[in-house]
Amino acid sequence: MKLNTSKVRRSILESLESRTLFNVDPIWIGGVYIEEDGGSDLHGDSLFIQFKGGAPDTKLTKLLINTDQGLPGFSQGDNLFDTIKGGRGADEAFAFQIVGEDGRFSSANVGVELSDGGMLLTLTFDNFRSTDRLKISVDVDEVQFLNDPNNIPLFNSDLDPITSGAEFARSKLTAYFSAPHFEDAIANTVYRNEYDQEFVGSGLTLPKDNDGGLRDRTAGTATSIVQIPKPISLSGTVYVDNNLNLIQETAEKGIPNVTLELFRLQNGNYVTTGHTTTTNLLGQYEFGVNLGLQPGTYQVRETQPNGYLSVGAVTGLLNGNELGKTVSGNRDILTDISIPLGDSHGTRLDFAEAQPVQIRGFVYSDLDDDGVRENGEIGIGGIEIQIVSIETISGTINQTIRTNSDGSYRFEGLPPGRYQVIQREQPVGYLDGKDSPGTINGQTRGNSTVNDQFTEIDLRGAEEGVDYNFGEILPASVSGHVYHDANDDGIFQSTEDGISNVIVRLESSNGVSEIRTDHLGRYRFEGLTPGSYRIIEVTPTGYLDGKDRVGIVSGSVVGMIDGNDAIRSIALNAGNSGVDYNFGELLPSSLSGHVYVDANGDCMRDPEEDPLGDVLIE
């Protein structure tokens, strides 16, 4: 049977996983601080920010610079941002500015949260991408000695307006990243006075420790993190596909409580993930994101549900594209399910199942030879019936059974497919009759162009073929006598002798048969199929043709005289015995006398009365 090949892809197992699909470069994030004043507080200080790498479309969404280096709150050695003259801070104050080295950063795409005298700078970004470099300017002062923070003049008196690289060191940088298909990532690092070694291998293009000879005025930091893909999911349905088209249609229900197991490709082999699931009442299953499945190449294996036969696995969809491959020779596996990106969800990874089919019928005595099994037509038991598959969804079928005592047979639990049913033997005492293809869902399917065989019986899931019947015929016979009808009354009587070795012929649409009467004048034609017959007798030598008589079939006179020595229109049904189709014959008679001269006129010939010769007698 032809499956819907538009939905089926045949393949072999892949040997290697393309790991390049699933790995991404790490994110490198770095920052550099430069004190821009050498002995007086005349300029804002510079902060550089840059990141590189990560997954495609990775963005830096938020950045925190925390200058609280000790216990929470102001401590000796902490730094603060001096943005408003007359507030908390030493000497001059310089408000936050976006310098934007790359020329595209501005207040329109950089959000700022910063309080004068605060120790936390928060920046948010709309579109900060890999290799972008941001420069900002803001005044940074150091708490050289800690005085009462609530007494601002006293507190400011021991602030250092010049914050060297060593003094900015131990400030903390926290960066937040987002990227499609990956979990949000957070990088934490600490500024160091000597930082060039931190940048090795990063690819970042930030100022070096001694850039411009400002080694004692710089601090920097760099670190790398690896993004974690968001978990993926795989889902599908196990459903009843009795029409075998590998498409779940509205009326095709899911199959609950079917077990599925998930495997992952590792080092060229599929190994179990340890995850199994069962279908719900609608036949649906899912290996969900709660399992934390990472991008990779997977395989789903179905445990064949009881009472069903596999139609096939159906490749799924990922973002509208075909997902996975079927396995030649195993319809319970979907393999090569390649999910290269996190937060991807493979769907419609389905398994189609069909219910078994059956076919039944009778071997029976077809009394009227019409090919239709009717009331009163008995079954014939013990006859060998064979079913052979032409094509099925599950292997080759070749089974043989015998009919029950009522003539019935039934083949059950068959895989859907195309079949032929064969009657292997002719019942003893019967002639072969008409075979009638049965029906499936009220429609005739199959044909009987070959005797005692039905073929091309196409059974879809859960279908039952009924009345695939083989008719048999009880043979008919016709008999009678050829006899000497002594009294010429056309009735054979026990005292009248039969005539042996007389030729009797039987004509029908099947041809002509010829026999001779036995020593009692009897003849009998046996093994006749239902039909209309004509009997012809050849008048035996030495006899004259007598009267012929139409015989009896089932108590009724059947046939008619057809001229001399023939009886026609003898209608015989299956099992009929026509009797007393008799042909009477006559022995010839003689007549003699004299022509003479009746001298005395007494009409009696006397011895002396002379004969007359040469007289014409008619």
Name the predicted role of every residue range.
Residues 1-25:
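Subset of Sec-pathway N-terminal targeting signals
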Residues 25-228:
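Extracellular or exported targeting regions of proteins
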Residues 46, 229-249, 259, 345-373, ...:
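A short, Gly/Thr-enriched small/hydrophobic beta-strand-prone motif that recurs across taxa
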Residues 134, 283-287, 335, 347-349, ...:
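Short strand-edge motifs at loop-to-beta-strand transitions and within beta-strands
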Residues 242-249, 254, 266-288, 367-374, ...:
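Short, acidic Ser/Thr/Gly-rich low-complexity loop/linker segments typical of extracellular
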Residues 279-291, 351, 403-411, 470, ...:
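Glycine-centered loop-to-beta-strand initiation motif
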Residues 294-307, 417-428, 531-542, 616:
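A short, solvent-exposed beta-strand micro-motif common in secreted/extracellular proteins
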Residues 304-347, 425-466, 539-579:
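Structured interaction patches on ligand/partner-binding surfaces of diverse proteins
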